[in-house]
A protein has these predicted regions:
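Sec-dependent N-terminal signal peptides
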Residues: 17-25
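Sec/Tat signal peptide C-region and signal peptidase I cleavage site
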Residues: 26-30
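A general lysine-centric signal
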Residues: 15-16, 93
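Short, Lys/Arg-enriched N-terminal segments with co-localized hydrophobic residues
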Residues: 2-13
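Flexible, solvent-exposed loop/hinge segments and secondary-structure transition points
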Residues: 31-166
């Protein structure tokens, strides 16, 4: 009987140890799940308000476009007085910035230096004005403005990003 109790006690102790180890492993696994930053509605509204304010200061009518990191449309607004072509231009610039993680001006500069390969990139758009939105060096989206001079479009986009990150 004593032998049975010793063996039974040993097995119970081992079972408890196994449960503790598995529990610790599950907690460790859950703790290691990555957290992902993304553009929620509040972030988008902050960026749009800053872009609208900057465009108004500069007395320009622009279309503002914000995409998520996969190039999906999150926000699009054409100001009164902005031409219709700015809708597509803003979308293409924002998508390029989001997908490739660099300003759309990079594609423009590459094309100007003779690299025609830029023209065959899917969703490539060689025109300044689109910027990637990065938080902690991770791309969470892209923003672009279109309707003013290209450098002004980019400056307005940068003001919007700065408003988000402050």
């Amino acid at each position: 009987m004593t032998r049975f109790i010793l063996i039974f006690g040993y097995h119970v102790a081992m079972l408890k140890l196994l449960v503790i180890c598995l529990s610790a492993a599950l907690v460790a696994s859950a703790a290691e799940l990555p957290t992902r930053k993304y553009l929620n509605l509040a972030a988008i509204k902050t960026m749009v308000a800053a872009a609208e304010s900057e465009a108004q200061k500069r007395n320009v009518q622009v279309t503002i476009c914000i995409m998520d990191e996969s190039g999906n449309l999150l926000f699009l607004q054409k100001a009164d007085g902005a031409t219709l072509n700015t809708i597509q231009f803003a979308q293409k610039k924002a998508k390029y910035a989001a997908l490739y993680g660099r300003p759309s001006k990079v594609a423009e500069d590459s094309l100007k230096s003779g690299n025609l390969g830029v023209l065959v990139f899917p969703d490539g758009f060689p025109n300044q004005g689109g910027l990637p939105i990065k938080v902690d060096d991770k791309i969470i989206g892209g923003i672009a403005c279109s309707g003013a001079a290209s450098e002004v479009d980019e400056a307005i986009s940068q003001v919007a990003i700065n408003a988000l990150l402050k």
